[in-house]
Amino acid sequence: MDDIPIWRIRQAGPEDAEALSLVGSATFLESFAGVVDGSGIIAHCVHQHSAETYRAYLAKGAKAWLAEVEPGHAPVGYAMVCAPELELAHAGDLELKRIYMLSRYQGTVLASALMQAVVAAASGHARLLLGVKEDNRRALSFYAKHGFETIGTRRFDVGGKTYDDFVLARVLTPAPAQ
């Protein structure tokens, strides 16, 4: 997209749970329709992308950011970090649980700005971890561009069907001593 509108990245709070849910469900459907079984997508979105799920993550200390565009701060992407839920996590790691962008805005400055916000917030952690579907080449390329490397694999359930994911990590620069 060459003509990107005025945009911003801002930290999201519990009051943004509906926007996180909407973007999470829309991007999951957009990314995996025709790849993952339709009923599985619906079940996954109902459970994993509900506003209640986002409120619960935020209440437990997760942090999220929204990418918004004008007019009216329309949500087009988001990222969320939380305490690691991945088996390959070590003490001091942080998990990039989700980073999603509507396809119209993928490959624009918004996606990189969203990742920069996440990396800045992760300062002081040892590594930033994430899981990604093993054949999602576009996402794998984006993560490689941002310093992530494959450290292992996991199985990921979507609506009762299991898929293979890569687990990626980015080593973070320690926070400066004060």
Cite the ranges covered by each PLM segment.
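Conserved active-site alpha-helix within GNAT-family acetyltransferase domains
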Residues: 112, 135-152, 161-163
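Accessory recognition modules or surfaces
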Residues: 162-171
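Acetyl-CoA-dependent GNAT
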Residues: 3-7, 11-17, 22-106, 112-121, ...
